Amino acid sequence: MVDADAGVGIVGGGLAGALLALALRERGVPVLLLEAADGASATDLSYGVIPGIPLDPSPLARRAAAAARIWQALQRRHGDLGWRPRRSLPLPLSQVDTVRLKQRLGPVLAAAGVEQRRARVLALQPGGDRWALSLEGGERVAPARLVLAAGAGCLALAAELTAGLGMSWAGVLALPPAAAGASYPLKLPTRFTRLALEGRARALQQPAWVVDAGLVPWGEGGLAGQLSWLAASGAVSAGPDPAQAEGWLRHALATAPAPLAALAAASGDYRQVPVAFSRHGLPLAGRLPGGVWLFSGFRGAFAQVPLLAPLLAAALAAPAAAAAAAERELRQLGVWPALRAAG
């Protein structure tokens, strides 16, 4: 077994894991960030949209409405991360271009001193005062503290997390570059029906899906979508047949208002990824009874994660009084997990 020197091991190198790693490094904490080597992540195919006003009356939504300022501060500290102001009515919005974010995260994490490793985590094993991770290839690491921030991948490592997390599949069309000198407009649905579908996930007796027709700039191209598919009860599943799901998405786009309707026949690659959602509506950020920490289940991750990552870093690594204060704040925001132990 390799006894990792990292003070904190984070499983998942998407938005949640990366911003938590940066927040921990600001506190001088050694960090090992483990990311599976294959496939797109939910971060890669996210719209990256950040509303500038609260979308519900919860304390978290009120605080997350200021996320654009946090992104601006992150970019002043680390350089361009893809955050851009966007013109959109009736709501003030900004967006993180996830193509640019993906290009920049690796170098930014390296510059911050985060140890990054491409390796799939196969299993967790409790051992003494820390958890050991079995990695693909036979290696084992045992960081002093462990955070699961791998989205839907968390469910494969700790099945009991299904009490608080469900799985959906998100499908989008990755569109080719727009005409020279042009870019795709940002068009969002007036409401996201995905949230209502997730809210009734436990009652689903068969798979169900919805399409929230929208379009965002994505690198030089665009993302059109989004299809959301849930298995019965929102359980872990292999997802829908991609060809069939692409047909559902294109049919829904064809009935949407212009300019979305024209995208129904557009060239573009259909892509789908598993996504973790919170069964209680609020994300989960905190320590489980068995000692593993969880950072997952976001609704609007690009607004919620930048707010919560520094608080979770403080709860993990600050001196006792400051750590307790951070935990109280996470509890007040309603995100501290109330789940039984992993293992």
Question: Which role does the model predict for each range below?
Answer:
Residues 117-131:
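A conserved short coil-to-beta-strand element within the FAD-binding core of flavoproteins
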Residues 47-95, 103, 107, 111, ...:
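Dinucleotide-binding Rossmann-like beta1-alpha1 core, especially the glycine-rich loop
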Residues 254-343:
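C-terminal catalytic lobe of FAD-dependent flavoproteins
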Residues 2-16:
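Beta1/beta-strand and adjacent pyrophosphate-binding region of the FAD-binding site
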Residues 152-289:
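Active-site substrate-recognition segment that forms the wall
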Residues 25-45:
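Glycine-rich FAD pyrophosphate-binding loop
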Residues 9-11, 141-153, 309:
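Short hydrophobic core segments
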Residues 41-43, 72-89, 165, 319-327:
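A short alpha-helix-loop-beta-strand transition element characteristic
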